[in-house]
């Protein structure tokens, strides 16, 4: 045979599926790093966009264009009444007069409210200055100065305590300025909890003319902006009316988005179907349950655990970095921070190993009691191989006893030292208690002396007063007798 026969020749491999157009959390699925390609698909759950209407609504979010005048809580309560759902929440309060992006979470999606409330926000604001500026470029310059970490105190009329706090303005741009009407329009990207009203007042102070906020609109809240399928309250009401009267789901499905839209920015870890329900019950994700993972995951990063169908299971804290995930063959991948998926949507798959199955069979045959404990019918081999938890504890206790006998002289020394230290501490405590008692006694005596002194002085004053009154009366009598 010639040497050429043993050369590995290139093969025409088929092109991998293009997942750049796949929806939500499955986008660019092929670019995830593969830990294992082997798993058993379970016919449970469904793709977020193909859920039945009831579960689609109960795990949905609405990117609402909040109208001016009603408060955020009122708007959310109206949506709850319109959609007839159990609970609703929103992504951060907007003042009654403020309009724009308000993310309304429904039922299961309310578990993501906290993460959205802490996310960054973007606003377009109209500021009214109290006087004309000498140089129109001053407004842009002072806006640039007001970036980074700023001290802010909540406005006079606010629902929170007016404490000084630090808030960050990431970026701001002046859009337009009319010096004749003293009006300026600017855009700002800032941290959650920033007061734009206070920012406008600070702008006026910097410019030396004074100013206040005229109008405000939020254009982005967390993951969603005003360009991401924003709807009005009328749309929500019309969609529910159309469904009630014509049974047409399309309008409702178009205004409500799956909760996975809020998690698109998180790094992903794909979980085997058999491990999903265990994670829903709060179990940590281990290496055997891992299918794919994203590049650039660092230790303690906030990540999202997803199923092979693209459903969000939970928001979790990574316990391994990408490098560890590639090299480790056992260990904890992530611990659950906030579970999103319903329990028992996927079937239970724990307790299905060979030992667990054998134990189950032996219980049925009467070779173990109903609690899985050894009885008279248990085979000797099982007793040798399988060590239950209480036996393990007994064995550890016996080993501890042997260790204790060896370490008795050491312990005696340690105990004597500890006793000495304790006696010293007790003596110090006694001295302290004596001092305290003495101080209390002295204080009491001083107080009593002071009270006695005060009483004596009062008595003397009364006597003096009485004597002076008696003297006056005698003088009057003598005068009358002379007359």
Swiss-Prot record:
Q: Which reaction does it catalyse?
A: uridine in 5S rRNA = pseudouridine in 5S rRNA; uridine in snRNA = pseudouridine in snRNA; a uridine in mRNA = a pseudouridine in mRNA
Give the similarity note: Belongs to the pseudouridine synthase TruB family.
Q: Which GO terms describe its molecular function?
A: DNA binding; mRNA binding; pseudouridine synthase activity; snRNA pseudouridine synthase activity
In its UniProt entry, what is this protein called?
H/ACA ribonucleoprotein complex subunit CBF5
Signal sequence segment: none
Gene name on record?
CBF5
User: Which parts of this chain are annotated as the region Disordered?
Assistant: 357-483
| Principal subcellular localisation of the protein | nucleus
Q: Where is there biased composition of kind Basic residues?
A: 437-465
Q: Which SMART domains match?
A: DKCLD (SM01136), PUA (SM00359)
The entry's active site is 95 (nucleophile)
Sorted alphabetically, the Gene Ontology cellular component annotations on this record are: 90S preribosome; box H/ACA snoRNP complex; chromosome, centromeric region; cytoplasm; microtubule
Sites where Phosphothreonine occurs are at 378
Q: Which residues form the PUA domain?
A: 266-341
List Phosphoserine occurrences by residue. 47
Task: State where composition is biased (Basic and acidic residues).
Answer: 362-373, 408-436, 466-477
Pfam families linked:
DKCLD, PUA, TruB_C_2, TruB_N
| Enzyme class, first EC level, given as a word | isomerase
**Entry's EC annotation:** 5.4.99.-
Provide the taxonomic classification.
Eukaryota, Fungi, Dikarya, Ascomycota, Saccharomycotina
The job of this chain, per UniProt, is described as: Catalytic subunit of H/ACA small nucleolar ribonucleoprotein (H/ACA snoRNP) complex, which catalyzes pseudouridylation of rRNA. This involves the isomerization of uridine such that the ribose is subsequently attached to C5, instead of the normal N1. Pseudouridine ('psi') residues may serve to stabilize the conformation of rRNAs and play a central role in ribosomal RNA processing. The H/ACA snoRNP complex also mediates pseudouridylation of other types of RNAs. Catalyzes pseudouridylation at position 93 in U2 snRNA.
> What InterPro entries does the record point to?
Dyskerin-like, PsdUridine_synth_cat_dom_sf, PsdUridine_synth_N, PUA, PUA-like_sf, PUA_sf, tRNA_PsdUridine_synth_B_fam, TruB_C
Covalent cross-link (Glycyl lysine isopeptide (Lys-Gly) (interchain with G-Cter in ubiquitin)), residues: 9, 267
The GO annotation for biological process reads: box H/ACA sno(s)RNA 3'-end processing; cell division; mRNA pseudouridine synthesis; rRNA modification; rRNA processing; rRNA pseudouridine synthesis; snoRNA guided rRNA pseudouridine synthesis; snRNA pseudouridine synthesis
Record's subunit section: Component of the small nucleolar ribonucleoprotein particles containing H/ACA-type snoRNAs (H/ACA snoRNPs). The protein component of the H/ACA snoRNP contains CBF5, GAR1, NHP2 and NOP10. The complex contains a stable core composed of CBF5 and NOP10, to which GAR1 and NHP2 subsequently bind. Also interacts with NAF1 and SHQ1, which may be required for assembly of H/ACA snoRNP complexes. May also associate with the CBF3 110 kDa subunit (CBF2). Interacts with the trimethylguanosine synthase (TGS1) and with NOP53.
Keyword terms: Cell cycle, Cell division, Centromere, Chromosome, Cytoplasm, Cytoskeleton, DNA-binding, Isomerase, Isopeptide bond, Microtubule, Mitosis, Nucleus, Phosphoprotein, Repeat, Ribonucleoprotein, Ribosome biogenesis, RNA-binding, rRNA processing, Ubl conjugation
Anything else of interest in the record? Present with 33600 molecules/cell in log phase SD medium.
The listed locations are:
Nucleus, Nucleolus; Chromosome, Centromere; Cytoplasm, Cytoskeleton
């Amino acid at each position: 045979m010639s040497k050429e026969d043993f050369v590995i020749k290139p093969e025409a491999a088929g092109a991998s599926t293009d997942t750049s157009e796949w929806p939500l959390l499955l986008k660019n699925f092929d670019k995830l790093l593969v830990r294992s390609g082997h798993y058993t698909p379970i016919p449970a759950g469904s793709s977020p966009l193909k859920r039945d209407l009831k579960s689609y609504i109960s795990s949905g979010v609405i990117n609402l264009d909040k109208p001016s005048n009603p408060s955020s809580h009122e708007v959310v309560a109206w949506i709850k009444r319109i959609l007839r759902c159990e609970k609703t929440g929103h992504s951060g309060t907007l003042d009654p007069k403020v309009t724009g992006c308000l993310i309304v979470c429904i039922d299961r999606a309310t578990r993501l409210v906290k993460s959205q409330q802490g996310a960054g926000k973007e606003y377009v604001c109209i500021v009214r200055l109290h006087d004309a500026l000498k140089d129109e470029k001053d407004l842009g310059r002072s806006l640039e100065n007001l970036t980074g970490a700023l001290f802010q105190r909540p406005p006079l009329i606010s629902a929170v305590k007016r404490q000084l706090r630090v808030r960050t303005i990431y970026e701001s741009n002046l859009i337009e300025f009319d010096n004749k009407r003293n009006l300026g329009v600017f855009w700002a990207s800032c941290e959650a909890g920033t007061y734009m009203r206070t920012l406008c007042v600070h702008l006026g102070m910097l410019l030396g003319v004074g100013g206040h906020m005229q109008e405000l609109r939020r254009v982005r809240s967390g993951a969603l902006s005003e360009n991401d399928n924003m709807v009005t309250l009328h749309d929500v009401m019309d969609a529910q009316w159309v469904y009630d009267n014509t049974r047409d789901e399309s309008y409702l499905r178009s205004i409500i988005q799956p909760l996975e839209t809020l998690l698109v920015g998180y790094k992903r870890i794909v979980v085997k179907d058999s491990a999903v329900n265990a994670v829903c019950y709060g179990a940590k994700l281990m290496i055997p349950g891992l299918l794919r993972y994203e590049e650039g995951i660092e230790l303690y990063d906030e990540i999202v655990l997803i199923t092979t169908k693209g459903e969000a299971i939970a928001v979790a804290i990574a316990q391994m970095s990408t490098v560890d995930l590639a090299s480790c063959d056992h260990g904890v991948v992530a611990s659950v921070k906030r579970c999103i998926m319903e329990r028992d949507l996927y079937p239970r798959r724990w307790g299905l190993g060979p030992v667990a199955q054998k134990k189950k069979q032996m219980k049925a045959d009467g070779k173990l009691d109903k609690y899985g404990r050894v009885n008279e019918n248990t085979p000797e081999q099982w007793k040798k191989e399988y060590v239950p938890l209480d036996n393990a504890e007994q064995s550890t206790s016996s080993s501890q006893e042997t260790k204790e006998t060896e370490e008795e002289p050491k312990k005696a020394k340690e105990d004597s030292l500890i006793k000495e230290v304790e006696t010293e501490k007790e003596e110090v405590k006694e001295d302290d208690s004596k001092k305290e008692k003495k101080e209390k006694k002295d204080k009491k005596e001083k107080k009593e002396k002071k009270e006695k002194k005060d009483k004596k002085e009062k008595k003397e004053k009364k006597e003096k007063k009485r004597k002076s009154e008696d003297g006056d009366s005698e003088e009057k009598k003598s005068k009358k007798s002379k007359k």
